[in-house]
Amino acid sequence: MATYVIGDLQGCLTPLVQLLEQINYHPEQDKLWFAGDLINRGEESLETLRFIKSLGNNATVVLGNHDLHLLAVSHGYGKLKRGDTLAEILTAGDRDDLMDWLRHQPLFHYDEQLNTVMTHAGIPPCWDLQKAQTLAKEVEDKLKSDSVDEFFATMYGNKPNTWSDDLTGLDRLRAITNYLTRMRFCDENSKLDLESKEGINTATKGYAPWFNYPTKVPEDCHIVFGHWAALEGKTQKERIHALDTGCVWGGSLTALRLEDQQRFSTPCSINRKNP
């Protein structure tokens, strides 16, 4: 039995099928983790969502910012952006089933046996493992609730950009969501810079990649995340694994086998909708 963590798909099903063939995936014994952003930009978003849902208990998913964007639009909040490839999902006959399944997925997953935690964007320096899990559950519970519309109505926005335990209500949920699904750079106090999106060397003065600061996550715990294609899969940290390698932009799709930290990748042709 093996567990593979796969980076951002963004609606690229064909490379996923190729990667599963490469790793000789056996559904009766192997498990797949997906680090979020299952859909959007790629031309196979509907097929990708259906495929991952069909994997059932073999798939563990955490939500990314594109997945949350789809959910918000499906609830009547937010607007489709140029380059989005979500219309086919929104008009599909099984749309409601897909959206219900998606909003019941977590933002945080921790496997005690593998001592590995997965979120879409990472874990900010100011949170320990238990705090990250507890805060993620606040958003997860809201997503599953009958009052989810008020969350989607206020989900978009870059503020608050500094964590405080005193945050309450929808501001608190937006901050948690941004840390877990949009974070790249922050300062030593975990204040977010959500404007900078390129590589490590492009940080605004006073900011650095979140994983370059001392972390409260135990030293023996591995962190796997996606979201940041400009890293090209590199963090220079032995236990912090970046898995978004830009599949939808013509890069590659990457899987990390957790049992031995071996990486597998398959090259991708550009598979995005032209803006």
From Swiss-Prot:
Record organism: Marinomonas sp. (strain MWYL1)
Protein family membership: Belongs to the Ap4A hydrolase family.
EC number: 3.6.1.41
Pfam family, one: Metallophos
Name of the molecule in the record: Bis(5'-nucleosyl)-tetraphosphatase, symmetrical
Keyword terms, alphabetized: Hydrolase
MF terms (GO), sorted A to Z: bis(5'-nucleosyl)-tetraphosphatase (symmetrical) activity
CDD domains found in the cross-reference section: MPP_ApaH
Function description: Hydrolyzes diadenosine 5',5'''-P1,P4-tetraphosphate to yield ADP.
Swiss-Prot/TrEMBL catalytic activity: P(1),P(4)-bis(5'-adenosyl) tetraphosphate + H2O = 2 ADP + 2 H(+)
HAMAP family reported in the protein's UniProt record: ApaH
